[in-house]
Amino acid sequence: RDRRQRQMCIRDSLPPERWPQLQGLAVATGPGGFTGTRLTVVMARTLAQQLDCPLLGVSSYALMAPRLERQLPQAMQGEPFWITQELPRRGVVGGQYRITAGQVHELSLPTLLPQGASPQPAVEVQLDVEADVARLLQLLQRSHAAGAAMPWAEVLPIYPTSPVGQV
């Protein structure tokens, strides 16, 4: 039943007769909820493979990095900074970024930080789905215009913590 609902949602949003017109797909790779991240990345990979079209995967933190950097004091902008998120009962997830000439450089992928770690400067995750989706589509357009290959097989979800505890 859930699979059928997802298929209908995809077909309603993008009818199959328009699929050949796709020039590329894009997906946020996380971090995010385990099930949601896994399902969206797998769905995007499957569609890209079956439609033989490029797939751009970008971490959720990299998508929000340009807007979160603006919260830092002017003197710190352009320097490396951390994006962090406290996970109840798990710890703090953090990734390190630097914005130069409008480009996001992901210096450290989001990962579970050692207990007690407090990287600085740091900005707390702030969700803005509309802004992040717009940025993701903008990055897809730029990558496509630049002729980037964007193979689907290289797009993997980011899991900074295990859904089954310590592994």
Model-assigned labels for residue ranges:
Residues 1-10:
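Single conserved hydrophobic/aromatic residue that forms the stacking wall/gate
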Residues 6, 22, 78-81:
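Local beta-strand N-terminus motif with an aromatic residue
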Residues 9, 26, 82:
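Conserved beta-strand segments that form the floor/walls of ligand-binding pockets within enzyme
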Residues 11-24:
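Phosphate/pyrophosphate-binding loops at sites that engage ATP/ADP/AMP, CoA/4′-phosphopantetheine
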Residues 21-27, 121-123:
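Glycine/charged-rich beta-loop-alpha catalytic/anionic-binding loops adjacent to active sites
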Residues 24-60:
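DPxDG-like acidic metal-binding loop motif
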Residues 56-167:
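Oxyanion-binding and handling regions
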